[in-house]
């Protein structure tokens, strides 16, 4: 019975774990905390989750297992009392452009079903409501007319078509019909009827004339069947002294003659040809070449190199073919190539960009001699599109793609579905309009939905499921998102909370959920909602194990495990375990000391004064409400606000992109704004984000920071290397010479397993050391180049203490809290937070101009209190060098140390997009409208 109450872990030694023994209570909310790199993830994901998954796999048949691949057994002696495990981490976010919030949560699937079952179809051309009726329903509608009403049953055989239509009239005559109505006038079929073939005609055969009275149902039904047969399921009824009526057996518009297919759930799927827009295939957008990117500085002339797109950069050279084309165009259309591009008339501009139908004579002198060619110029955009299509090189394709931008599909306007599907409505909204509402507005729409009795009966169960799932998203603080939002644009925290909401919807019991920092990107105000969700999962009867640094989560947990005491080699032990109160009393726990207030990140005594201002005027990207925002120069600024308030739109989409375009000459298109004043005060902008420092295992901290070049120089200067004639290139694992050729310097060899995942094994020749034997024989202070790459930052610091240039570079890695990572650690194994701090360290090691503006988005992701302390010191150091630092952040320990706060809000989504408060933390704390101010006031008061 005891095994059921605890997950008993014995001898866990995965990665840096030091054979730890730990009992984690079952069916409780447990937080694993500790310094970055201390071993939390190794315990939670690489041990508990991996073993749970492996045991599940073992329970499957060998046939099923061959499709799933084998899972390594974690390095642990035993785990008892382990329930099935489900991991909700940040890395498994789906970046597929077809994946949306709606598809991930499965709410969209329910909406597809709802629209297929109770949706009202309309004509996609004229918008008229169209319905399908059986003959019985048509008879009932007509019998409901006033008794003695005279009616004519008409079969519309020709609708709006030119011609004499002799065959149609002849066929009607042969079938025994007597009268016909042409363009509103009745004719006898026995008389000679001649129609003008150049005019569009409407022809309806008069099938029957009736008076509504009891007992004519049978005749009415028979006549209607004849009408429907003649007119492909359509019937017109002329009511004498009344309104004409139209009936359709199919979904077709009587006015436009457009029919729509049977409405099914797949009709609303943008991942299915039956529902997807035929132009963009359901993506909602297209990649198109953009003039602004191809000719970024239109104040330059063509002679000065205004056109920078590949294939046309040579047009400044008089001997090139592209120049010959432009010379011919200039001669034909009377313009010159030495004036600013922006000064061309609309006509000339259009010829250059979109081409001309007129043939021009191009004189070109090439290697084969001189010739004159008649060419119809297709325009820069079409020419580059053709080059892009025809090239076989992936590298050149990638280069071309930097000149393209994503634009909404011209057919569906970004709605992803074909027009027939978008013409189906529920409560006057089509499926795109509903999924484009914020979750908050969607909940309101669903609660106020008025349906007919039939619709209510059919849709009741579907709506119940939709409402429940929408509420789960609100409960995890995502009410500002919409279902149509692509998952690739979500932050790690948002994606994780969506998956959390989906899990609650599944209602599983007796499972161990393992989460990785679900509070990322969440404002303090919404933290309670998240904690409520985690507790709800626990109360259902699940074990919830959370890797977390958030103070509120630790205090709310039933049990906290502090892993440490340090990071990397110095971590991997259980320092303390118990409730938050018990941790506070434990002198060995650094976490406990921060929780109790014994250790704290100090509030600066003085706030720096701005040295100038950078002003963004008329920002209106996404939900920004045409606002003007002033960013102070030479200080540390925090941009705060609830999730979805517009922080990223302002800082990343507008400010960074605009500065990168002007200062760094980057090919970017900023978000919508009017102007930015004060750019001349800066010389460059650097975005220190959490994207990987490299996409391949060949990239590592040593190569990224540039210290590897210095280390290779050092090895090349040794007596051994000089004797053998080795230069620094010998010590690179990227080029032939010094690397192991069996694995091309990778240290691992990929074995393709066809329908199983590829298997990577250490190279048998170099044993994973990446270099050949001769290179490894060259030693510096008794260590080979491989040994140096295998050192942790801390070890390297001691090893290179007498080499100042190398020491300085490595010291900054140590200062940002990365003492535990190895110099040669593949970039693919680094977390987002670690990658960001490597970039920060690289910037700190550079000589400062004092005119740089640094932008960071949530740099505290994955950081413990002690690491946040180090981070704030690093950011302050950047500012002390005269630079400007702008940080998007929710962490109060960072916010309270800022010189200036810009608080966005007041709410997320449509309720945001304005500046609620700005000023020093003390000034913002006094603003009653600011949610951030309320929490800043509390934290400052607590620290004084």
Question: What is each of the regions a protein language model found here?
Answer:
Residues 1-944:
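Conserved phosphate-binding elements of NTP-dependent enzyme cores
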């Amino acid at each position: 019975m005891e095994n059921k109450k605890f997950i008993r872990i014995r001898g866990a030694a995965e990665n840096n774990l030091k054979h730890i023994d730990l009992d984690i209570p079952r069916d409780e909310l447990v937080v694993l905390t500790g310094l970055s790199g201390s071993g939390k993830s190794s315990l939670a994901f690489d041990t508990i989750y991996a073993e749970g998954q492996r045991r599940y796999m073992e329970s499957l048949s060998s046939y099923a297992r061959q499709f799933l691949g084998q899972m390594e057994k974690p390095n642990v002696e035993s785990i008892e009392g382990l329930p099935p495990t489900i991991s909700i981490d940040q890395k498994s976010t789906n970046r597929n452009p077809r994946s949306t919030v709606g598809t991930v949560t499965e709410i969209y699937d329910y909406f597809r079903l709802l629209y297929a079952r109770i949706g009202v179809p309309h004509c996609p051309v004229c918008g008229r409501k169209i319905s399908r009726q059986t003959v019985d329903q048509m008879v009932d509608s007509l019998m409901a007319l006033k008794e003695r009403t005279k009616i004519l049953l008409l079969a519309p055989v020709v609708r709006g078509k030119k011609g004499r239509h002799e065959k149609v009239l002849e066929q009607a005559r042969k079938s025994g019909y007597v009268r016909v109505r042409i363009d509103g006038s009745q004719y006898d079929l026995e008389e000679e009827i001649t129609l003008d073939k150049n005019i569009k005609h409407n022809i309806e055969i008069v099938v029957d004339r009736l008076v509504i009275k009891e007992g004519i149902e049978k005749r009415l039904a028979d006549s209607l069947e004849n009408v429907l047969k003649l007119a492909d399921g359509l019937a017109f009824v002329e009511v004498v002294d009344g309104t004409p009526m139209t009936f359709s057996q199919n979904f077709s518009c009587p006015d436009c003659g457009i029919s729509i297919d049977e409405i099914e759930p797949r009709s609303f799927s943008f991942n299915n040809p039956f529902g997807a827009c035929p132009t963009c295939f359901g993506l909602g957008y297209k990649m198109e070449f953009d003039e602004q990117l191809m000719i970024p500085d239109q104040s330059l002339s063509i002679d000065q190199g205004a056109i920078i797109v590949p294939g046309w950069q040579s047009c400044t050279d008089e001997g090139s073919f592209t120049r010959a084309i432009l010379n011919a165009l200039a001669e034909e259309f009377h313009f010159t190539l030495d004036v600013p591009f922006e000064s061309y008339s609309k006509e000339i501009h259009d010829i250059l960009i979109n081409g001309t139908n007129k043939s021009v004579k191009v004189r070109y002198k090439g290697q084969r001699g001189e010739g004159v060619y008649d060419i119809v110029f297709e325009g820069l955009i079409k020419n580059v599109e053709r080059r892009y299509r025809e090239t076989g090189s992936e590298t050149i394709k990638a280069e071309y793609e930097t000149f393209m931008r994503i634009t909404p599909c011209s057919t569906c306007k970004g709605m992803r579905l074909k027009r027939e599907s978008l013409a189906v409505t529920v409560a006057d909204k089509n499926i795109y309009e509903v999924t484009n509402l914020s979750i908050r507005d969607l909940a309101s729409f669903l609660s106020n939905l008025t349906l007919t009795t039939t619709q209510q009966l059919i849709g009741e169960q579907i709506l119940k499921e939709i409402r429940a799932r929408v509420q789960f998203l609100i409960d995890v603080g995502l009410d500002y998102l919409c279902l149509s939002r692509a998952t690739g644009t979500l932050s790690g925290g948002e994606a994780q909370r969506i998956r959390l909401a989906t899990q609650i919807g599944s209602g599983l019991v007796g499972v161990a959920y393992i989460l990785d920092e679900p509070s990322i990107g969440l404002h303090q105000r919404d933290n309670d909602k998240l904690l409520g969700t985690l507790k709800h999962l626990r109360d259902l009867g699940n074990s919830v194990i959370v890797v977390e640094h958030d103070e509120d989560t630790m205090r709310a947990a039933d049990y906290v495990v502090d892993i440490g005491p340090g990071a990397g080699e110095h971590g991997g032990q259980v320092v303390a375990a118990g409730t938050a109160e018990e941790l506070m009393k434990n002198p060995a726990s650094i976490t406990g000391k921060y929780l109790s207030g014994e250790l704290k990140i100090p509030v600066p005594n003085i706030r720096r004064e701005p040295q100038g201002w950078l002003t963004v005027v008329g920002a209106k990207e996404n939900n920004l409400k045409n606002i003007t925002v002033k960013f102070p120069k030479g200080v540390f600024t925090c941009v705060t606000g609830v999730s979805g308030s517009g922080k990223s739109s302002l800082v990343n989409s507008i400010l960074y992109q605009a500065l990168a375009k002007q200062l760094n000459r980057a090919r970017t298109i900023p978000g919508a704004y009017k102007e930015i004043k004060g750019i001349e005060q800066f010389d460059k902008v650097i975005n220190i984000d959490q994207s990987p420092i490299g996409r391949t295992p060949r990239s590592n901290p040593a190569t990224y920071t540039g210290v590897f070049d210095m280390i290779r120089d050092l090895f090349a200067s040794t007596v051994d290397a000089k004797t053998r004639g080795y230069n620094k290139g010998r010590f690179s694992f990227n080029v032939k010479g010094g690397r192991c050729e069996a694995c091309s310097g990778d240290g691992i060899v990929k074995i393709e397993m066809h329908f199983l995942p590829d298997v990577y094994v250490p190279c048998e020749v170099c044993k994973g050391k990446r270099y050949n034997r001769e290179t490894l024989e060259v030693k510096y202070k008794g260590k080979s180049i491989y040994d140096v790459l295998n050192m942790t930052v801390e070890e390297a610091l001691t090893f290179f203490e007498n080499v100042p240039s190398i020491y300085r570079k490595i010291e900054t890695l140590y200062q940002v809290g990365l003492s535990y990572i190895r110099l040669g650690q593949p970039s693919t194994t680094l977390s987002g937070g670690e990658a960001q701090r490597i970039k920060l360290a690289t910037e700190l090691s550079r000589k400062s101009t004092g005119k740089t503006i640094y932008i960071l988005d949530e740099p505290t992701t994955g950081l413990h209190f002690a690491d946040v302390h180090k981070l704030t010191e690093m950011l302050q150091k950047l500012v002390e060098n005269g630079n400007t630092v702008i940080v998007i952040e929710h962490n109060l320990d960072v916010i309270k140390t800022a010189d200036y706060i810009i608080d966005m809000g007041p709410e997320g989504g449509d309720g945001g997009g304005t500046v609620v408060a700005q000023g020093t933390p003390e000034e913002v704390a006094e603003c009653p409208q600011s949610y951030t101010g309320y929490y800043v006031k509390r934290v400052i008061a607590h620290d004084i």
